[in-house]
Amino acid sequence: MKKFIKSAISFTAIIVLCLSIAGCSLFKAPDKGSIDNIDDSKVLASTLNFATQNVSERKLLTGAEACALVERSVVALEIVYQGGTSYGSGVIIQNEDADANSKIFYIITCHHVISSLGTINVYVPDENGRNFTDGDYNSEYKFTGVIDNKIHTDKAVTLVGGDKDGDIAVLKLNTTGKNVNIVSANVPVEGYSVKKGEEVFAVGNPTGQLPGTYQDGVIGYIEREATINSVGIMSLYQINVDITHGNSGGGLFNMYGELIGITNAGSDENEGLNYSIPFEGTDSFVTVAKQLIATATDSNYGYVSGRWSLGITIADKTNFGLVVNSVETGSDADKAGVLANDVIVGIKYTDKNNQPVSKEVSSSSSFTLVYYEIKEFLTSGDKISLIVNRGSPINQTLELTLTQNIFCDTGFYPTAE
């Protein structure tokens, strides 16, 4: 049986929710075009590259040297939402072809850090490396924005896009009008690959009140499959670097001072067993971030092609089994006729061998196992059926067509030319 590993986000108020398979609230505007008119995100992302070091200047560094090189690229995040405040970390990056005097930067963080929505405060280390907890911190390095299903171009911090499955979100940082010096991180040069046993270090904001903290360790395993609480099954770097609440979204660096991972989870039960989203692979933070940036438009947020979300929350209830708590308006489940208080007893789908499959479900855990299994191969446009009971002897079968999921979807899409 797989254990759920806790994501390392720090909360000042915690609300326990049942399993949620949904994104930001949806608003659809059919007259504004269709998501089908947008090019595939992987094609668009292939034209983007993040900044790397000059190969001639690249060299192995001591821990102190590497930390000094990158620590100002790691920011502290504070999200004030209805019901509380949460904290996390993020890493500043730039496109490879960004102008040296550019006032626009990107911040990569974890999706679960910003998924509660609300006001977001970004605290960038100031020109002297001081952080927001220091009394003499330069407040010019504090930037504010709002995360919801509207585009806020008047804010210094704006959402570019978020991807729940990859646990990556990208923010845009606009420093126009401020006399600040921003340091961005570099991703590894072409040809580099992380090795097991390699020395690494993390910079983040443990507890939400200790920004700029350096913690070192090694890569324990390259492609460790782990089930991350509130995210799902992921292929991650296993590291023994200490990752605690508030570190989520922070940077994992190699001894060249290159950003090789985004820290996202740790285990409260097993000391030294922690995780980071890799820079390599199909769902690497580089791949996901590039797709989010490439597909973002003036009217809607970025996305990763093929991702879908049912749009329901579920819970186990005594004597009732698996019950739908709520259905998101406009979601795939809503369009199929799923109702709050429906009892889900089964799910039907076509597997990757094109064979029909029907599975019974009786609890949130059994439903979750099937859900993450089919997430591996079903994509937007595919169909599944939920078998539900509404108190009668005969069950009902509701067919859902899976549609592209956009976190904080504004409902406005480009119109076909």
Language model: regions and residue ranges:
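Active-site-proximal beta-strands of protease catalytic cores
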Residues: S25, S73-E78, N101-C110, A156-V157, ...
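N-terminal activation segment of mature serine protease catalytic domains
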Residues: F27-A100, I107-C110, G118-T119, G166-I168, ...
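C-terminal cap/linker of serine protease catalytic domains
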Residues: L61-G63, L259-F320, V370-E373, K383, ...
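Active-site substrate-binding loop(s) of clan PA
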Residues: A66, E96, T158-V160, G177-Q209, ...
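Active-site region of chymotrypsin-like
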Residues: S73, N174-A185, T213-S276, D316-N325
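PDZ/PDZ-like domain segments forming the peptide/carboxylate-binding groove
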Residues: S89, D97-D99, V183, D242-G246, ...
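Catalytic-histidine neighborhood of serine endopeptidases
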Residues: N95-D165, I374
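PDZ domains, with a preference for the canonical peptide-binding region formed by the helix
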Residues: F279, G346-I387, P393
